[in-house]
């Protein structure tokens, strides 16, 4: 099974990651990871840090001559802001010594951020450690670690893609409004990669040009209003075999794991599998996906619709996995909100810390990564193996076995 840990602060020298459990003999190069690190900076409405960072992963172990070894893989991504920013981060984030005498402590928590909760939990008198570790900068390393899982899925014809369906008040209201376009892209391209490639061409990662233009205008107006925006995105996984996940234990249910994967990302406050929220107010006859006869040699029974999002009983059906994430507006606003200075106990307005107007497009690419990691773990649980050739033998045996 895969497991990864990340370490590092947003304005420290670097962020670090370690991934264990990756099978041996998996083709892997830094380019496989850097492609998706670059995509993480996509999207209209990003802040100043996107002009400072140029994320490139360094692999220090677990890979030799372009293939994984089966041992832990370690990564490093340097923080460009550490040296390029003129705020004196090498001194403010020093590992040793004492704080600079002129360093101002952060004592004003921002509503909606981890500042106050982290200060109280870890008893910091300065919220800078909370701000820097809870920052979405950490997701760069998540994307790096999870890109290995994505590369593993690709070896077996499983692809992951995403697109944005709403930013603030602008976007689609019902899944049927974008499903045909999404499905056509996937069918024409042969998998979910075609979905993300098309979305990446849009300033807002949407697959509808008219909606992209409206969202850009909405973001521009929100910037003038000194506010921020959240939104909704959809992640799709194609090529998934039936039987991943399980109904026999609560923690093996794949739909529950997918929701956790989305909501573990900073600022994501809700998730649904398939048409979950919409299904709640529809009659069952319009929700459940009719089963059709399968072709000779096929593993999965096709469904006329996919409102369930590719799972039933926490187990994959063979239909594409569909999961949506709901992101709250970024809590760092140009417009001050009411807060309290924890050093004095007096009411004070918040101060602005560099941020985006919206990062929903970026969040959708991070969600691709966490979903890929989750599906890869379910895949390994079913098929197992210490190397890619061993896993391939297990997959081929499963496909060849009669399954009534």
From Swiss-Prot:
Entry keyword annotation includes Flavoprotein: yes
Residues that, per the record, bind FMN: 133-135, 266-267, 313, 328-332, 354
EC numbers for this chain: 4.2.3.5
GO cellular component, one term: cytosol
Keywords: Amino-acid biosynthesis, Aromatic amino acid biosynthesis, FAD, Flavoprotein, FMN, Lyase, NADP
Record field: transmembrane: none
Pathway named in the protein's UniProt entry: Metabolic intermediate biosynthesis; chorismate biosynthesis; chorismate from D-erythrose 4-phosphate and phosphoenolpyruvate: step 7/7
One BP term from GO: chorismate biosynthetic process
Catalytic activities: 5-O-(1-carboxyvinyl)-3-phosphoshikimate = chorismate + phosphate
Cofactor: FMNH2
Annotated segments matching region Disordered: 283-320, 337-357
Principal EC category: lyase
Source taxon at top rank: Bacteria
Family: Belongs to the chorismate synthase family.
The protein's assembly and partners: Homotetramer.
Protein name: Chorismate synthase
Organism: Salinibacter ruber (strain DSM 13855 / M31)
